[in-house]
Amino acid sequence: VRPDGTLAPIRGGGALGTFELHPNPKLDVYFNYGVEYAYRTDFNFTNVAGANVSVGYGSPFFNNSGCELAPTLPGGAFAASNNGACSGNTRNIQEGTVGFWHKFYSGPKGNLRWGLQYSYFVKNSWSGNNNTPTAVGVNAKAVDNMFWTSFRYYIP
């Protein structure tokens, strides 16, 4: 949203690629990579009180001071408490995946396959310094390593 209240589209882009190998009739190996990106769409203005105000998406003046803090649990509660300020506007998301499927039975009663997959996921945010020009902006980064296994039965 612009300072005058009108909507401002967020430009972005993305890509996805896949590479597959079939070294033999019983084995399929695959590699996938995907990325999405959102550009900064930020605006600054002075409000009626004379203060500088940042609006929009990905402003370098947003407060990200709490983005690198681990949430703490208050006494006896099961939900995480507020860990501070973190606008955390997403800059990009990337994921790489590698896996395989092995067909270990194929017959008149159907097909049985098993597979393994590993995925590496990264989310980066736009940096923000809480409208403090002398401060270095904080940009949060989240990383997730994932492993899956699966068994499939295909009806004939």
Task: Identify the meaning behind each predicted range.
Residues 1-7, 40-90, 125-141:
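Solvent-exposed loop segments that connect transmembrane elements
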Residues 9-15, 92-96, 141-147:
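Residues that define the transmembrane beta-barrel architecture of outer-membrane proteins
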Residues 14-46, 96:
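Loop/turn-rich, solvent-exposed surfaces of beta-rich toroidal or solenoidal domains
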Residues 15-21, 98-102, 116-118, 149-153:
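Residues on the lipid-exposed face of transmembrane beta-strands in outer-membrane beta-barrel proteins
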Residues 26, 105-114, 156:
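Short loop/turn motifs that connect adjacent beta-strands in outer-membrane beta-barrel proteins
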Residues 29-31, 96, 112-116, 147-149:
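Transmembrane beta-strands of outer-membrane beta-barrel proteins
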Residues 33-39, 104, 118-124, 153-155:
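Transmembrane beta-strands of outer-membrane beta-barrel pores
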Residues 108-109, 115-134:
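C-terminal beta-signal and adjacent terminal beta-strands/loops
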